[in-house]
Amino acid sequence: SPESVQERFDATFTGVSAVEISLMEHELMNSDSGVTFEDVMELCDVHANLFKNAVKGVEVEDTEHPGHPVRVFKDENLALRAALIRVRRLLSTYESVDDEEMLVEMRKGLVRQMGLVGQFDIHYQRKEELFFPIMERYGHDSPPKVMWGVDDQIRDLFQTALVATKSLPEVPISTVKEAFEAFATEFESMIFKEESILLMILLESFTQDDWIQIAEESDAYGYAIIRPSEKWVPERQPFVEEKSVEEPTQLETVDGQVQQVIDTPEGQFTITFTPKEKETVLDRNSQQAFGNGYLSVEQANLILNHLPMEITFVNKDDIFQYYNDNTPADEMIFKRTPSQVGRNVELCHPPKYLEKVKAIMQGL
């Protein structure tokens, strides 16, 4: 029975980390087993339910601080759950109401509450565009593919439910309830996957710098239902010691070797080393040959940023390498943020569009 399988699984796999689940998915999808990400996506609910009692929790400082991306993510899920409850109540009450004026108001309320629920798309987009690129950098490339595919299925289910809701009273309330519950079931399951598996992977893998970058870029995508109550500014500890005021007493060069004499309370000692070649630092204001004339990097940057168009550059290896900065992030036609630079362009799009993206790239 499913219960006995769950019991055996819990007894065997208790204490598994979310990162280990990620590695399992990666191994399945990248081995010769013939398992594709579509197969893993189809069984996503199955293995999420199996692992629900086994995943080991992770605690990281500051994640419950207002404004921290993890706190924002969880707060959004709470607000979205509350909106789901309100829709369910309205749908449940609708069947028992006979007054036509009240039914009209209830239909308006349903559409309004569905509009709030629909803001989950902002939550998903921020997850896909800010969390997933950093996950891929750390080698966790399989969970994003699977989760993005399921996200798109949930988006489709929501659209079906929204169309049905807006079609009242032409369609029966039973049809609306059925469509809404089909969406809500998958949506609530995704909340569990986000908070019990996805966030655990992120907390084990991401550095404070990663979270700071996500917090800084989140405004470009917006927030679902609620906004952070304050900006998260973590305390930063300097790890580089200040240079000592005392400098070495002597520096001599002998046959290309540098000898450095250092004074200590016990006396002097000499170290000999071959200095590294100094890397040439590009002067952003120096003139470089550019097309039919000369431009500095700063001048070229200003020109590109003042063109009346959004520019994205993908190199010959299909790596997203550059975008110009002429439009506020929240007004971009195609939202791009610094965390996406360096990402394979195929990973910048939902899995269901992968073949279309490949065809476009090959055509270019």
Descriptions of predicted regions:
Residues 1-121, 125-363:
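Small-residue-biased structural context
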